[in-house]
């Protein structure tokens, strides 16, 4: 694709608006106020940005996002997807945030403490936080009452439709009962207010305007990590009353209220979002912000590379072909600028669909029978060699991307300092195996030989009428050649690992929304999706796959196992037994509240059971190579929550960072973590 890049006498932002880099202008949504290049410059003044190299920092910054990750909800209380949180985290603050080391730091809460047994947590709030509208005009003052309103909204089934209830109902006294009450009330629950929640005995109170107290069901020494999640964000009753429940639930950048570091200057759906500083941000004096931050939607990494070369982007991740182009030419200027990023705090997995439909809406019985078979699923975890596919994400060190666990590494540690996934590895029997750059760890025991499992699966499935090869339908966004290239490599991995007589990958496309076009009609055989923790405990991962829980995200929205449980077929009996056993193990682990080590050991057993039965098949960690004008190690790096894309205190440079500089950043970061 040829792109007519602009001359340097107009701004980069003007180019992006005019070029329509993803091919569709979408809907223009903007609020009032100046659109000049100086807009927000006064509000941006505050703390100096970090500068460890003496470089000239950037005042404006242009980042990117994949075209298939467009924001779908601007309401953090309602949304459960990271692609939404990555946007709205810049607009809406909660009790706490995080620093570049992943440590909890104050946001609207200035400090917090727990009682002796960690059942009562008290948060002390700032007295200088305001809601502003999309024009940056102050609308209301934020007090502890706004957090009561926010929690009532989340717990009210009529208002928030069961979204984001798992954290409060799991931990807060009376929260589950209040949620069930509103669920039973139906539409009438829409009339309830926060006082009704308090009267029902939910364990939250506001003794004064700037104090918030939570009472937990059981001792919870990590509750501060729970309270950092969006379930506990504030909301304004004034705005809810003004918009009405349905409009507030579906609010957008033009009618929402802001209390974060930025407001949206302009939003062109499917194209760009531009943010300017919130002129009334409470922490303006203590954080650095950009005068303008633009996020460009990118449908193709080849286009992204062209944009970066012309300084229409300030950072890009590099795919395999671009790295090959750079490294194959010793004179290429970018050879010295290749920067390996740290792993994003997400664990990606292959989420099987246990109730797949055909395009005409009829059940895909062949797939549904096959995926219900244990031996069939075990072939994915024990035999699918993904090294070539990992190379699409990390050409230089592909096996650094290998993920053998459902829970993300680094989420939590027991009292002996043992990282949780090492407990899972011990249960799985490969705790002694280390990264060698050559072979996937989970394939070493049998060399990836699944001939016996394959024979068993084909015999058992043939007996109930399954025909081979089984077609595994995998959807990618139609506009991305990079996604097609990735899928082509994945298809070859299937062929090499399974044989074309057993399982064949069928690559299909969707236009713009995976949710609306694929997941809702249940057309996929599997989706490869990442989960970032909401708080610092394994239940936040493992609880998403359990039965009998309205809040189990993947069970309801990806695997559809919750629907299968309503009326399982005979061939799904063993599958349901496995999910019931897994659910029991998770619930038993979750019930251990006074012994952290025993709790994590029990969760590790539950996770090992999940992996042995391959209810989900882990795939990769996102460890990319990049070209960048931002120091990745200066950005927020939280292991949980949705704050990592909050653009404050970023170290940037007019000149691109070099490989050597990034190695120095990594060493300094590791030393700070270990020290």
Regions found by a protein language model. Give the residues of each.
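N-terminal secretory signal peptides
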Residues: 1-10, 14, 18-28
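Ligand/substrate-recognition segments at binding pockets and active sites
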Residues: 269, 307, 397-398, 434-533, ...
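Detector for C-terminal structural segments
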Residues: 379-426, 478, 482-492, 518-675
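N-terminal lobe/hinge region of extracytoplasmic solute-binding protein
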Residues: 63-117, 257
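Alpha-helical secondary-structure segments
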Residues: 139, 143-149, 209-215, 261, ...
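Gly/Pro-rich hinge or "lid" segments in bacterial periplasmic/extracellular proteins
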Residues: 187-201, 207-211, 215-294, 655-675
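Aromatic- and charge-enriched surface segment that lines or borders ligand/interaction sites
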Residues: 110-175, 213, 304-307, 366-372, ...
């Amino acid at each position: 694709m040829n792109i007519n890049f602009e001359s340097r006498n107009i701004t980069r932002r003007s180019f992006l608006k005019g070029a329509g880099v993803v091919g569709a202008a979408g809907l223009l949504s903007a609020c009032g106020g100046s659109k000049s290049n100086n807009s927000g410059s006064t509000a941006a003044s505050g703390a100096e940005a970090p500068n460890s190299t003496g470089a000239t920092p950037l005042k404006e910054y242009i980042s990117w996002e994949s075209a298939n990750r467009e924001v779908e909800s601007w309401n953090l209380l309602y949304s459960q997807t990271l692609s939404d949180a990555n946007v709205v985290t810049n607009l809406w603050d909660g009790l706490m945030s995080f620093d570049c080391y992943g440590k909890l730091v104050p946001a609207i809460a200035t400090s917090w403490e727990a009682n002796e047994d960690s059942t009562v947590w008290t948060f002390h709030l700032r007295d200088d936080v305001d809601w502003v509208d999309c024009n940056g005009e102050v609308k209301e003052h934020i007090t502890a009452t706004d957090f009561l309103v926010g929690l009532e909204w989340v717990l009210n089934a009529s208002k928030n439709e069961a979204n984001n209830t798992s954290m409060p109902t799991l931990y807060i006294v009376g929260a589950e009962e209040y949620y069930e009450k509103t669920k039973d009330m139906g539409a009438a629950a829409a009339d309830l207010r926060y006082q009704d929640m308090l009267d029902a005995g939910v364990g939250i109170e506001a003794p004064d305007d700037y104090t918030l107290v939570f009472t937990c069901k059981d001792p919870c020494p990590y509750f501060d990590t729970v309270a950092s999640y969006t379930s506990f964000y504030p909301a304004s009753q004034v705005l809810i009353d003004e918009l009405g429940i349905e409009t507030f639930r579906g609010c957008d950048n033009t009618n929402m209220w802001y209390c974060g570091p930025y407001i949206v200057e302009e939003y062109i759906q499917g194209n760009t979002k531009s943010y300017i500083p919130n002129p009334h941000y409470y922490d303006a004096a203590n954080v650095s912000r950009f005068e303008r931050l633009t996020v460009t939607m990118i449908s193709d990494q080849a286009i992204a590379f062209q944009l970066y070369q012309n300084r229409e982007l300030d950072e890009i991740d590099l795919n395999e072909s671009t790295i090959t182009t750079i490294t194959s030419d010793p004179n290429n200027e970018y050879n010295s600028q290749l920067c390996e990023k740290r792993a994003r705090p997400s664990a990606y997995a292959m989420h099987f669909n246990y109730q797949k439909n055909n395009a005409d809406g009829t059940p895909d019985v062949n797939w549904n029978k096959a995926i219900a078979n244990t031996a069939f699923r075990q072939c994915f975890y024990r035999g699918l060699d993904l090294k070539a596919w990992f190379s699409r994400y990390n050409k230089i060190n592909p096996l650094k991307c290998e993920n053998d666990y459902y829970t993300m590494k680094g989420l939590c540690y027991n009292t002996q300092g043992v990282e949780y996934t090492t407990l899972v590895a011990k249960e799985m029997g490969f705790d002694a195996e280390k990264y060698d750059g050559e072979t996937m760890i989970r394939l070493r025991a049998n060399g990836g030989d699944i001939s016996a499992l394959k024979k068993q699966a084909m015999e058992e499935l043939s007996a109930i009428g399954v025909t081979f090869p089984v077609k595994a339908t995998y959807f990618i966004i139609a506009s991305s050649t990079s996604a097609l290239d990735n899928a082509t490599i994945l298809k070859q991995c299937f062929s090499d690992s399974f044989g074309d007589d057993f399982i064949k990958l069928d690559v299909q496309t969707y236009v713009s929304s995976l949710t609306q076009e694929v997941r809702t009609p249940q057309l996929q055989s599997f989706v490869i999706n990442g989960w970032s923790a909401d708080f610092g405990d394994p239940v936040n991962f493992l609880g998403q796959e359990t039965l009998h829980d309205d809040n189990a995200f993947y069970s309801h929205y990806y695997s559809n196992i919750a629907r299968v449980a309503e009326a399982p077929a005979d061939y799904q009996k063993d599958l349901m037994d496995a999910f019931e056993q897994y659910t029991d193990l998770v619930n038993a682990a979750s019930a251990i509240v006074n012994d952290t080590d025993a709790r994590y050991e029990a969760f590790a057993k539950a996770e090992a059971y999940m992996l042995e039965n391959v209810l989900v098949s882990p795939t990769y960690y996102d460890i990319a190579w990049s070209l960048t004008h931002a120091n990745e190690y200066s950005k927020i790096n939280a292991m949980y929550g949705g704050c990592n894309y909050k653009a404050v205190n970023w170290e940037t440079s007019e000149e691109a960072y070099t490989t050597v500089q990034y190695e120095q950043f990594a060493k300094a970061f590791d030393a700070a973590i270990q020290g």
